């Protein structure tokens, strides 16, 4: 294998790896990191919205049609609010995501 072929293979591998995305697994749910970032955006918009919030057991974001598809099953859970909170916490912790090589257990 020539040096240019090896370089092309490395670049292709990196592109494929980044295209797959990062997934978070929590209590039987598997969601994309990008979906949790979108969840944060939606919740920030909900907080800044002066309209009255819906009452009920479900978090308000569960009523938002822009909620990513992989997060919608969480809304069917009785622990939806605590699950969303945990996902947001995990998404902001570099060691939980194994982004930082200095973290143990990655």
Swiss-Prot record:
InterPro entries linked to this entry: Guanylin, Guanylin_sf
Entry superkingdom: Eukaryota
Biological processes per GO annotation: adipose tissue development; body fluid secretion; cGMP-mediated signaling; energy homeostasis; glucose homeostasis; multicellular organism growth; negative regulation of blood pressure; reduction of food intake in response to dietary excess
Entry keyword annotation includes Disulfide bond: yes
One CC-aspect GO term: extracellular region
Disulphide connectivity of cysteines: 62-75, 95-103, 98-106
Subcellular location: Secreted
Assigned protein family: Belongs to the guanylin family.
Name of the protein described by the UniProt record: Guanylate cyclase activator 2B
Gene: Guca2b
